[in-house]
Amino acid sequence: MIEANILLIAVAVLVMAALYSTVGHGGGSGDLAVLAIAAIAPEEMRPTALLLNIVVSSITTWKFVATGTFRKDLFLPLVCASIPAAFFGGYVEIPSVLYKPIVGVVLLFAAIRLFVPTRGTEKTKQPLLYIVLCIGVVIGFLSGIIGVGGGIFLSPLILLLGWTTAKQTAAMSAPFILVNSVAGLSGMIVDRGDFPVDLSFAMPLALAVVVGGTIGATIGSKKLGHQGLRTVLGVVLLIASAKMFITMNSTPNPPQSDTVKSTS
C-alpha cells in the first residue's frame, strides 16, 4: 500500500512538473497540492516541495537560459532584493484560515489578466531600478510567507508590466525560483538543525520530476510561441488558484497552533 501510494504521488508530481516547467516554473504550489491530498504531514510537505522545486527549476533554468532570452540586468537586482526578504518572510506566521484564500485570489486575478489579449507586440520597456528592487522585496517576502519559490507572482507581474516577453518571462522565472527555493530550504536546515527531508520518500518523487521537468522545459523552451506560453501560464495559475480554494479546509495532521509558518 505504501509503495502504491508513493507511485501515485510520483505520477502526480511528474504531471505537475511537466505542466509547470513549460513556463519555467518549478511546480512548488502544485507539489504542495499533491502532498496535501496525499495527507502528508505539513512539516514534511514544505521541505519536500522545496526540494522538488529545486530539482525542476534547475532543469528549467538550464533549458530556458540556453534560449538566449535571459535578462541578467533585470534578474540580478530582483534576486538581490528577494532572497533576504524571503528569509525574513519565512519566519513570519499568519493565520491558517487566511493563507490559502489570499494566495487563491492573487493567482486567480493573475490568470484572468493573462487570458486577456495583449494590445502590443513583443516590445519591452526598461524599468527603474528602485521599482525592480521594491518588487523583488515584496515578491520575496510574500513568497517567504506562503512557502513557494515566487515564480507564480513574478511571471504574471513582469509580463503584464511589459518588462519581458513571454520567453524572457520563463527564462527569468526559472532561476528566480531556483535561488529562492534554495534559500528557503537552507533556512529550514538552519532552523531545524538537520536536513528536513525524508530522502526515502523524496527520492522517487525527485526522479519523477526530473522526467516531467525535462519534458515540460523542452517543450516550453523550443516549441511554444508567445501566445502559447501566455495561455499555458494562465492555465497553470488557474490550477494553482483552484487548488488553494479546494484544499482550504483540508489541513492534514494540523500543527498545534492555528498558524502557518512558511519556509519561503
Model-derived features: where do they sit?
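Membrane-embedded alpha-helices of multi-pass transport/permease systems
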Residues: I59-W62, A66, I145, G149-I152, ...
